[in-house]
Amino acid sequence: MALVSAVPLNSKLCLRRTLFGFSHELKAIHSTVPNLGMCRGGKSIAPSMSMSSTTSVSNEDGVPRRIAGHHSNLWDDDSIASLSTSYEAPSYRKRADKLIGEVKNIFDLMSVEDGVFTSPLSDLHHRLWMVDSVERLGIDRHFKDEINSALDHVYSYWTEKGIGRGRESGVTDLNSTALGLRTLRLHGYTVSSHVLDHFKNEKGQFTCSAIQTEGEIRDVLNLFRASLIAFPGEKIMEAAEIFSTMYLKDALQKIPPSGLSQEIEYLLEFGWHTNLPRMETRMYIDVFGEDTTFETPYLIREKLLELAKLEFNIFHSLVKRELQSLSRWWKDYGFPEITFSRHRHVEYYTLAACIANDPKHSAFRLGFGKISHMITILDDIYDTFGTMEELKLLTAAFKRWDPSSIECLPDYMKGVYMAVYDNINEMAREAQKIQGWDTVSYARKSWEAFIGAYIQEAKWISSGYLPTFDEYLENGKVSFGSRITTLEPMLTLGFPLPPRILQEIDFPSKFNDLICAILRLKGDTQCYKADRARGEEASAVSCYMKDHPGITEEDAVNQVNAMVDNLTKELNWELLRPDSGVPISYKKVAFDICRVFHYGYKYRDGFSVASIEIKNLVTRTVVETVPL
């Protein structure tokens, strides 16, 4: 049933679908017509199905409309349906479980005093290497207790000058200290960046030898990785990032193509805030075996690598089924008939899979993909296609949150409204099983605020009003939609989120406010030109220029990017500060979703134009397996 004609205006029936299944049930809608005042007597408006590269079209109803000419969905149903995998056999899971046990034994051996893996001259670095390896290989969820034990041991030997390679090394080591600073900080330990001061010369500069050995390059590579986990005001981290970036770029000009050069290029390009875990795992699997600077037994490396490949491919078999389910959902609601809008459900799902690779988190991955897709459709309706009269009707319908409200909507809006209504209610039911309380009212409030911000922007477009920067940002933090894409899928994860915890993660916490501000500003630096061409004048860039007469567009973009950099350091602190009373793992979900959108806006507006980078991400992380 096509979305544009899914529910005729005089129909008393509504096609209901479930979020995680596709059983259809026809239910009668209340016969009472909603008292919305603006409801037009029986007039329905269906959009023209012809695409245009212009920004203004006239439909068969004679209503002038703007469309953006977005390209079509790149992932056809046949491609999704034909995805195959050979890793569903129980034998692969059995082998992976055996390897998990063997790796646990390796962790256990590290706790044996003066054992084969615990030389007092290298035990600290060995523990850090193991933790870092299982995390980057995407298998750390199996070793949470072992990781905590290893890091507790390292932290017990941490000093104001850092650490050496082992507890009896006698001298601090840049590689171990940098890796320790990064890893301990990310796990919530209190460690000061001032340990890096002890690796500067008398002039206060980081130094290196003229000959760039592989070992020294890896030292600086870990310094670079550590420098990205910076808090506000940490000048030493800024200096470390500048030095290590210059050093590594220079090294790339001198060393031959190798796993090391591939790793350097990857980390310089994606850093931390645009680095998605499964994307890094795919890269690290390719280069893991080439690092021989640390004398870890070959057998350990082989076990870790085999386990990482198996887990990557076993997860791929689950991804295949979830993608096929998502594709059916997309067709089932008639979304393909909405040709004036973007269709990026496959890309959104991929981004979710890149930050949530636990098989138990299927509801999160599918929920994020579906909500993000529906928000994108609504964005195109409010920003371009809908008339102001229609948008007021849709806004009132969302505020009412009643399926009978569709009787007052144009045909092309009916299916969109019911898709949101059905799926949010279904997701709330899934969340209630975990949270123990009804999350529908919580979700409704967030959607009301979101739609309210959308209609405000539509009014600005309609009237030609250009707000001040502060006025724009306050509204834009809500209209970006990150709160919705974060909160509702997160409630389906397997841990409880009582009100006290939610207040530290969701609105109006500083943590949530920073994420919303960062994403609005970052998105605008990549979208403002295309938005302006469609008649959407208000953006962070244009509003900043209004507040600062005479400033050039380039300088305004630079100023907004500088704001993003500063806010990102504040976000690092809010994520990792030890006194928040909220486990980092809870906040990490929202933080990782922030990274998802950071990645999407890294090169351009990757959510309007499915760039080669996004296509490659889908291919390498959810379409292809890795050879064993």
Swiss-Prot record:
InterPro entries reported for this sequence: Isoprenoid_synthase_dom_sf (IPR008949), Terpene_cyclase-like_1_C (IPR034741), Terpene_cyclase_plant_C1 (IPR044814), Terpene_synth_N (IPR001906), Terpene_synth_N_sf (IPR036965), Terpene_synthase-like (IPR050148), Terpene_synthase_metal-bd (IPR005630), Terpenoid_cyclase/PrenylTrfase (IPR008930)
Residues at which Mg(2+) 3 binds: D531
Annotated Gene Ontology cellular component terms: chloroplast
Binding site for Mg(2+) 2: D379, D383
Root EC class: lyase
Cofactor annotation comment: Binds 3 Mg(2+) or Mn(2+) ions per subunit.
Pfam families to which the protein is assigned, alphabetical: Terpene_synth, Terpene_synth_C
Reaction(s) this enzyme catalyzes, per UniProt: (2E)-geranyl diphosphate = (1R,5R)-alpha-pinene + diphosphate
The protein's Enzyme Commission number: 4.2.3.121
Functional pathway: Terpene metabolism; oleoresin biosynthesis
Annotated function: Involved in defensive oleoresin formation in conifers in response to insect attack or other injury. Involved in monoterpene (C10) olefins biosynthesis. Produces mainly (+)-alpha-pinene (97%) with a small amount of (-)-alpha-pinene (3%).
Name of the protein described by the UniProt record: (+)-alpha-pinene synthase, chloroplastic
Name of the gene this protein is made from: PT30
